[in-house]
Amino acid sequence: IGVVAQDSPASGDAAKAAGVPWSGYDSDQSTNYPEVWLTAATYEWSTYELPRIQAILDGTWVAGNYYGDMADGHIRLAPLGPIVTDETRALIEAKKAEIVANSGVMFSGPLKDNTGKEILPAGKQATYEELMGMNYLVEGVKGELPKG
């Protein structure tokens, strides 16, 4: 195993016991597992909830889907762990800036699944509906999705 990734602190225990890096999800565990911690995607729900609550109070709320991103502050990265090198930190910061600048572009082609089938042709951007209907593993990911 090269890296453990999951949203349970139990994964941190397993990563620590095995001495492998850990990338969490939805929770900052950087102080609990500093010797194996990489980072985690986290969510700041107030960026969504506060404007919606105000709209409800104002009588202007309209139902709809919300897909937050780094640009609106909804998606964040937890602190990078001490095992993350300076070179990697610089790459992460550059990629974060690129993601924010291209807010709304989550997947664009060319994109293939792990069987080599083209999912998105070069230059095409995935729609919200396509993202919500993802039922494949991308190129380079080993394994299969469960059937049924």
Feature locations, PLM:
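A residue-level marker of the well-folded mature domains of exported/periplasmic proteins
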Residues: 1-148
